[in-house]
């Protein structure tokens, strides 16, 4: 490999690293909402999996504790899935054209 090619690759890698950092900052600002129980339990979190809010409809507070715990877990899992999908969609534009193996997730 020639010096010019190596320098070009290094510059390209540095640019991608800067872009990844910017994307991580953007993902920290994007919020998704997971729901369960037809919207009676809601979890709002960022695409970096930081939970911002948990909302439980007051009608559930008198109900079975185990059921409420299951609904909270389901809403949380729904939010995590939505955050993953959103993150993958945002990152796919950055990784377009890169020869990454199937299932390879960014950021590492």
From Swiss-Prot:
Stored Pfam families: YbaB_DNA_bd
Cellular component, GO, one term: cytosol
Lineage top rank: taxon: Bacteria
One MF annotation (Gene Ontology) recorded for this entry: DNA binding
Keyword field: Cytoplasm, DNA-binding
Coarse class of the protein's main subcellular location: cytoplasm
UniProt-listed InterPro entries: YbaB-like_sf, YbaB/EbfC
Annotated compartments: Cytoplasm, Nucleoid
HAMAP family attached to this UniProt entry: DNA_YbaB_EbfC (MF_00274)
Function comment: Binds to DNA and alters its conformation. May be involved in regulation of gene expression, nucleoid organization and DNA protection.
Subunit structure: Homodimer.
Family to which this protein belongs: Belongs to the YbaB/EbfC family.
PANTHER family in alphabetical order: NUCLEOID-ASSOCIATED PROTEIN YBAB (PTHR33449:SF1)
Name of the protein: Nucleoid-associated protein BTH_I2220
Organism for this UniProt entry: Burkholderia thailandensis (strain ATCC 700388 / DSM 13276 / CCUG 48851 / CIP 106301 / E264)
